[in-house]
């Protein structure tokens, strides 16, 4: 699952959801917005700018996902949250890895995480683990969102 956090005047310029930032669920296959929430309630436009959130498309999406997926080799954690930024000069960068990430990502995506975790667990332990790019391709195919679920005004 993926989520983008957008700061607002209500969140005092911080990207903290509990302070009023907007959480935008992102399709794992495309990097496009699927749903957005503020204070756990659906929103279609940014409260300050008025921009339609359904129009959001994360640049360098595949690079971001591959970098996040490669964190598994570094940590061995089966489930983790990866906080990332897009630097103008350096591109995708990892800010931090969280062994116990928040669950607000489920609200922003309008979907539960448990079925995805069960799906992955049911795959079993392979003789050889797939590379990061292969894991990204698998997740995109299995967990991508269909067009009918995308936010609109």
Q: Model segments located where?
A:
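A short acidic/small-residue loop/turn micro-motif
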Residues: 7, 41, 100-102
């Amino acid at each position: 699952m993926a989520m983008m956090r957008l700061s607002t005047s209500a969140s005092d310029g911080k990207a903290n959801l509990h302070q009023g930032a907007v959480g935008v669920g992102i399709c794992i296959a495309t990097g496009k917005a699927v749903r957005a929430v503020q204070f756990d309630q659906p929103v279609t436009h940014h409260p300050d700018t008025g921009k339609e959130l359904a129009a959001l498309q994360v640049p360098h999406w595949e690079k971001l996902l591959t970098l996040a997926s490669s964190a598994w080799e570094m940590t061995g954690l089966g489930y983790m949250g990866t906080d990332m930024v897009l630097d103008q000069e350096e591109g995708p960068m990892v800010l931090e890895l969280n062994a116990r990430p928040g669950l607000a990502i489920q609200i922003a995506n309008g979907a539960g995480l448990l079925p995805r975790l069960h799906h992955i667990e049911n795959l079993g332990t392979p003789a050889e683990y797939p590379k990061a790019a292969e894991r990204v391709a698998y997740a995109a195919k299995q967990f991508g969102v269909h067009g009918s679920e995308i936010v609109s005004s």
